[in-house]
């Protein structure tokens, strides 16, 4: 079954912030990082349930899963939920950030 993937406005803003941060330091790396991230997001079109539940999944009424992207010091957690045949990317957080609290996440309606 193929899933549609939608990136929420909050996740889009977080991706943009990370891209700009990397671009200010190394434009080539930023472009490579962004292309890799988009390719990783695209993998959620097939078998998104292969990804583990997020550490914080019990805080939320819906199942929240995570997909890790990157290596070394550039690992990001893509937090998402699945509704029917749509995968919603909720947040994109650096792996070094503290775990989520319930008030950090608004699920799309």
Protein language model regions, located:
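Enriched for short, Lys/Arg-rich terminal
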Residues: 1, 69-109
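Short, hydrophobic secondary-structure boundary micro-motifs
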Residues: 31-32, 52-56, 100-101
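Residue-level recognition of specific faces of alpha-helices
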Residues: 14, 40-43, 66, 88
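Arg/Lys-rich, positively charged N-terminal/basic patches that mediate binding to nucleic acids
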Residues: 1-36, 40, 109
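Generic hydrophobic/packing signal
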Residues: 14, 23-25, 29, 49-52, ...
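A generic structural signal for ordered secondary structure
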Residues: 19, 30-34, 48, 82-87
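Generic structural signal for secondary-structure transition and capping sites
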Residues: 20, 27, 42, 46-50, ...
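Basic/aromatic recognition patch in beta-strand/loop cores that engages polyanionic ligands
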Residues: 46-86
């Amino acid at each position: 079954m193929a899933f549609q993937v939608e990136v929420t406005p909050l996740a889009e803003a977080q991706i943009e912030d990370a891209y700009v941060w990397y671009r200010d330091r190394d434009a080539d790396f930023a472009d490579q990082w962004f292309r890799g991230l988009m390719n990783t997001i695209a993998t959620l079109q097939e078998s998104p349930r292969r990804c583990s539940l997020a550490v914080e999944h019990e805080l939320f009424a819906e199942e929240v899963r995570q997909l890790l992207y990157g290596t070394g010091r550039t690992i990001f957690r893509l937090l998402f939920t699945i509704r029917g045949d749509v995968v919603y990317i909720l947040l994109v957080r650096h792996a070094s950030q503290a775990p989520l609290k319930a008030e950090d996440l608004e699920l799309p309606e």
